[in-house]
Amino acid sequence: MAKKYFGTDGVRGEVGQFPITPDFVLKLGYAAGQVLVQHDGGQKPTVLIGKDTRISGYMLEAALVAGFTAAGVNVIQTGPLPTPGVAYLTRALRLSAGVMISASHNVYSDNGIKFFAEGGVKLSDEIELEIEAKIDEEMKTQPSARLGRARRINGADDRYIEFCKSTFPSHLDLRGLKLVVDTAHGAGYDVAPKVFHELGAQVVSIGDEPNGYNINEKCGATHPKALQAAVLQNEADYGIALDGDGDRLMMVDRNGKVYDGDSLIYVIAKARAREGINIGGVVGTVMTNMAMEIALKEQGVDFCRAKVGDRYVLEQLNQRGWLIGGEASGHILCMDKHNTGDGIISALQVLAALQMLNQDLATICADWQPYPQTMINVRIQKGQKWQEASKDVLAEVEKELEGKGRVVLRASGTEPVVRVMVEARQADWAKKGAERIAAAITGKQ
């Protein structure tokens, strides 16, 4: 059954527009609360609510709290805390669920609601459908004796800081390193610099002055230019950039070069392989560069691809029992450290890997150079049989690449567009192949 409200990462949209309105979020909290009470055998469950730094977080938090307590659910509020921190505390405090109010890397005028189940894992499709089935039902507030309570927890950030530090090898530290940390004026603005400082690094913080309106604005993992400039200006060893909710990571070296999620995953995997740690393999996506796949296999590390989205990477990791995965966008999963993507913890694993290998980022990543890629967005009409139109040319291009490149055709889930991506060892091969396939789709061969 198709979901009506939940997307791949919870419920998200523009604030004030359905479904990110106070009345809908009130109903969402009430519906989720009803499902929790049913699954807890009629007991009074407890949920944790965290948020990022958007001005709308106050409004949406109040609506969620009202909905949950009306359904007979107790609520613990943390205030601003990264999404992976909410997942961790949901598990550590043995709560029935966790909720994060955030739109991740989006602009401040967007917001969203993301749920975690018991244990800090993402909700199953089945539970999301149960919640959706109750959203449109009439709200019937519990009798006063059954209403939930709401309270703020002290020290949530300190608990999360200690957890992050515990994932860094105990025989290593960060003394002697100068780091610039860009927290995108987001949920990690307070905790992230403290983690690196308490492990011994000299920390220069930027993007750490949230005002409710500046989250992700020309800063953070999606806008690394500010970090590049700060690293060069401060003559730092490395720069670390998170996104608004703290689950993405980009890094910059002392020369100002940016390293995306694929590069950082390779660094972590190579170090683990050299240390003899069995990670099983690495899960990337259909968009992961083929050169990285080849480089990993040269290190003796298996590789497979999932659909685009950290949710699908996580599914593959769990199915295969592998430990490392992620995307170029900076979502990195280290399953032996945390059960969700965590920008701070991922950065710590990269910094540990650099010490284990006794090399810098540039040296390690010189193992592979990304194959050139050409991406063309082709607009299509509703009902257009683009697969049939392109299949012959697609087969020709794949044959010509002779296993030294890849073709990915992907229909957009949000607009009438087919994304044509061709990757090859030579840029002109990629360009010509993508143009031929795009022409076949449009019928302009």
UniProtKB/Swiss-Prot annotation:
Chemical reaction(s) catalysed: alpha-D-glucosamine 1-phosphate = D-glucosamine 6-phosphate
Family stated for the protein in its record: Belongs to the phosphohexose mutase family.
Keywords noted in UniProt: Isomerase, Magnesium, Metal-binding, Phosphoprotein
Cellular component GO terms held in the UniProt record: cytosol
Example GO molecular function: magnesium ion binding
Modification Phosphoserine occurs at: 104
Active site: 104
Keyword match DNA-binding: no
Function: Catalyzes the conversion of glucosamine-6-phosphate to glucosamine-1-phosphate.
Binding positions for Mg(2+) per the UniProt entry: 104, 243, 245, 247
Protein name from the UniProt record: Phosphoglucosamine mutase
PTM: Activated by phosphorylation.
Pfam families: PGM_PMM_I, PGM_PMM_II, PGM_PMM_III, PGM_PMM_IV
